Amino acid sequence: MRVSLSWLKQLVQVTDSVEALAHRLSMAGFEEEEIEDLSARAKGVVVGFVKDREKHPNADKLSVCQVDIGSEESIQIVCGAKNVRAGLHVPVAMVGAELPAVNLTIKSGELRGVSSNGMICSLSELGLATESDGIAELDALTDELPALGAPVAPMLGLDDTVLELAITANRPDGLSMVGIAREVAALTGSALTLPVLTLKPAHELLQASAASAEAMQAGGLYGITLIEGVDGSQVSPTWVQQRLERAGINRVNAVVDITNVVMLEQGQPLHAFDADALEQLTGKPVNAASFGLRQAREGEAFIGLDGRELSLVARAQVVTCHDLPIALAGVMGSKASGVTAATGRIWLESAMFSPAAVRTTARSVGLRTDASARFEKGLPKEMTLACSIRALELLKELFPCEAKGLWVCGDSAADASSVLLRRNALHQLLGPIEDEEGSSDLADAVVEQCLTALGSELSPSDEGWNVIAPPSRRLDLAREIDLIEEVARLVGFDRFGAHLPDPLAPGALTPAQQAERRLRTLFCGAGLQEITTLSLVSASDSDPRIAISNPLLAETSHLRTNLWEEHLAVCVRNLKASQPGCWIFELGTTYAGSADAVEESRLLSGVICGEQRLERWTTSGKPAPPDYYAARGRLTEVMQALKLDVSDRRLTDDSRLHPGRAATLVLEGRPLGCFGQLHPELAASQNLPEATFLFELDLTRLVESATRRNRWVPAFKAFPTVPASERDLAVVVDRSQAASDLMQSIRKAGKPLLEAVTLIDRFEGDQLGENKASQAFRLRYRHQSETLTDDQVQPVHDKVRNALVKQHGAELRS
């Protein structure tokens, strides 16, 4: 919001310097983004008079001018403007002047051999227009010219300062000069001199269709006024032009400019339709009942005031006349119904549209205007019709116009319910004020002064005050805590002492949080990088997903059911970026069930794809992606560090994984997840290398097991003092038989003397038979206190051999 200081001073008494005022507003929540001194645009520019103009001797398009600037001697200036001539009063930039609008410093010099000691300026060079056809003719801009040599800034309206403030979403009142004036008055205690408004003007009922009436009342209010006797060709008076220029709004004509001035002053957007153009557009007589409000039809054509041709979508809301769209509700009017130089009658629209509907409409066409920015934040219903009367009064100052009627659909009265502000709640939350005399609770008189300064109505109660917020703040001051915040803001947050709870309890991580942190550290130590993927994904025909009600994009319209799909996409992006590999993991949540009963699952998922990001000197410069066992070993390292005994069980029915290189991971006798090489068909479809490995674990179960009591307590054992006895055992089993199952049977049968068992060899060949394989194990036996003899070892070893034969149908080879 650009705030003109001179306009602000007409609404409220300002005694602070502009810097002090900006600081006050920033501390109160309206952050100052820029302070622009408009006089800097014309610093060093004075009023001059062209006494004589001659053609340049060496250039057809240049003129040599003798300019009187009130000094004893005239100065010579070479000018290239077509409209320069003798007898004109012009703005003259003296040597040394800086023109920030065009980033130019004026210097003495020669143009085609003729000296020039200054520059005659155009309005664009002074920052008063986007483009200019020639130099500024001061005679046409004002009837009272300053003395020659006087600064030109005051007569051009550049004797002002503009504050640019950042307005937060909860303060729509800050998007109006009246709102800023009220804020300044509340902060400084200064008196207000606001325009007097007619809050409840006489009006008739707008007889709209049932559908339109429902849409209008859903938004809040719709008013339309017929005004005759305006002149669309008339240029706005200087004060209107200056207010618009300082606010950064382009001038159009006197009618449109007045609607924009009212919007800047009161915060209520207005729109003027050309009454005759509407009748020509629709081919029918137009009255108040001709106007309507509906959703756009898919593909409906619309040309806005900016000339853009739009194809509307059904979620956009349009204002209609005889069912033809004439405006995007709350955003922009149509070009065909806009005010032109031929306009003599207008329909003036003053409405309150639904913030959500305006936001949806603006987003659907990719257009955000000054009007839509205000509607989106919410407006007070009480001010809607009053602003149309305010615009009518300003139009009457310019034209001999007359209102033929005001028609309204909806109730202009708003619910002015009170909010109870409890004295104890205010003191408990804010604490005492600290000053040189000590600390004390905020006095009732100060609280009442703050709330009254905002325009609130107060009535005392046993507990404190019943507060009715002013219309402009009713959306913001809806709860007790909002009122307490306002009091603190106006008094000054820095004046309240700190009163933190005492004593402060030290924070600590839960065992589950510690386990997750350790998991992250261990995986990073194993060479993997943690990532975080978006939990919102697109719809899938093959994988039912829970839809969200208000998606921003179709690609983020559903909750994810897995992590691995996005992980593969991350790998693809990294490999396309010429990375040698992508080793990643994530601790994330997936969602299943329905919108009424969402089931959340915590997963640990990851992918090992390609080479680890290390130097190749260890592999003689050759690529060395991990094989199945190397990749599985990374996961084993992490599980062993957490003291978790995870075993593998053959997995063949997971369509994502290679049927011969996949395993179900088992923890404490129950499946924990899976690990395996990506299925060749899936890897090829994703353009991933064949040696891509995927793992997915139940994070909740993993953390539960890792946080069991004494799980991380180191168990110290004495070094063995007696030798071990080792025996090798080779058996022929089915080719599909997992070594882990055999080893589990060996451990169970070899108790208590068996200390360790290791797979040392696996062999397949025709001599063993079809679908047969030989697996060899090394068994280590040891007693805690004595050396074992063959007579002690052999019975246990025979027990192991018999268990393999009985449980797995093994054929003994040794």
Curated annotation (Swiss-Prot):
Kindly indicate whether the keyword Magnesium belongs to this entry: yes
Q: Which residues form the B5 domain?
A: 414-498
Coiled-coil stretches, from where to where?
Answer: none
Q: Which cofactor does it need?
A: Mg(2+)
Gene3D superfamilies under this entry?
3.30.56.10, Bira Bifunctional Protein, Domain 2, Ferrodoxin-fold anticodon-binding domain, Nucleic acid-binding proteins, Phenylalanyl-trna Synthetase, Chain B, domain 3
EC code: 6.1.1.20
Q: Which positions bind Mg(2+)?
A: D476, D482, E485, E486
Give the matching InterPro entries. aa-tRNA-synth_II/BPL/LPL, B3/B4_tRNA-bd, DNA-bd_dom_put_sf, Fdx_antiC-bd, Fdx_antiC-bd_sf, NA-bd_OB-fold, Phe-tRNA-ligase_IIc_bsu, Phe-tRNA-ligase_IIc_bsu_bact
EC category name: ligase
The record's section on NCBIfam families has: pheT_bact (TIGR00472), YtpR (NF045760)
Q: What name does this protein carry?
A: Phenylalanine--tRNA ligase beta subunit
Organism of this sequence: Parasynechococcus marenigrum (strain WH8102)
